[in-house]
Amino acid sequence: MGAKLVAATHNPGKVPEIAALLDGRFEIVTAGQLGLPEPDETESTFVGNALLKARHAADLSGLPALADDSGLSVTALDGAPGIFSARWAGPGKDFALAMKKVEERLEETASDDRTAWFTSALAVAWPNGPAVVVEGRVDGTLVFPGRGTRGFGYDPIFVPEGHALTFGEMEPAAKDAMSHRARAFAKLKAALFD
């Protein structure tokens, strides 16, 4: 295990995933464990919000920090929910409600287009110093009603391009091999270690 890296999250459940995706090269501690406040996400892009959160955690902790911002963008909804993906689930993080909202908004459009994409932006920032930012994306199609109980968020309504199963139906290892987050982490590892 290497140097400490702050995961700019208050969700300790993310630590094992982050550690695994970074091949165990860092000792991961969360912003929540350090008592750091969460910044307001005021940027208009996934990259902007990831960078804001990473810089905030790095500057307050004095340690390098990793942050992510991710979400679902729907072509027929002009990219919505986008950076507001989690907010569409409301304060209770009810993604059944969020998926219903996506379906209702699509029904209000005149479009039959059900294409969508997941984006994950990752940023690593050093205290008062440089930062590395990468983005991963996976394209697909939305299906209603949702299918499957695996994963989280919008996974039950998203079928990745070239596949028949939703992320919610896939074995976790299959989803993880192609997800937007895995693609972003592959780019991040290349930027940091190659």
UniProtKB/Swiss-Prot annotation:
It comes from Caulobacter vibrioides (strain ATCC 19089 / CIP 103742 / CB 15). Gene3D superfamilies: 3.90.950.10. Binds 1 Mg(2+) ion per subunit. GO terms for molecular function: dITP diphosphatase activity; ITP diphosphatase activity; metal ion binding; nucleotide binding; ribonucleoside triphosphate phosphatase activity; XTP diphosphatase activity. Its EC number is 3.6.1.66. It comes from the Bacteria. GO terms for biological process: nucleotide metabolic process; purine nucleoside triphosphate catabolic process. Its cofactor is Mg(2+). NCBIfam families: RdgB/HAM1 family non-canonical purine NTP pyrophosphatase. Mg(2+) binds at residues 40, 69. It holds the Pfam family Ham1p_like. This is dITP/XTP pyrophosphatase. It catalyses: XTP + H2O = XMP + diphosphate + H(+); dITP + H2O = dIMP + diphosphate + H(+); ITP + H2O = IMP + diphosphate + H(+). Pyrophosphatase that catalyzes the hydrolysis of nucleoside triphosphates to their monophosphate derivatives, with a high preference for the non-canonical purine nucleotides XTP (xanthosine triphosphate), dITP (deoxyinosine triphosphate) and ITP. Seems to function as a house-cleaning enzyme that removes non-canonical purine nucleotides from the nucleotide pool, thus preventing their incorporation into DNA/RNA and avoiding chromosomal lesions. Keywords: Hydrolase, Magnesium, Metal-binding, Nucleotide metabolism, Nucleotide-binding.
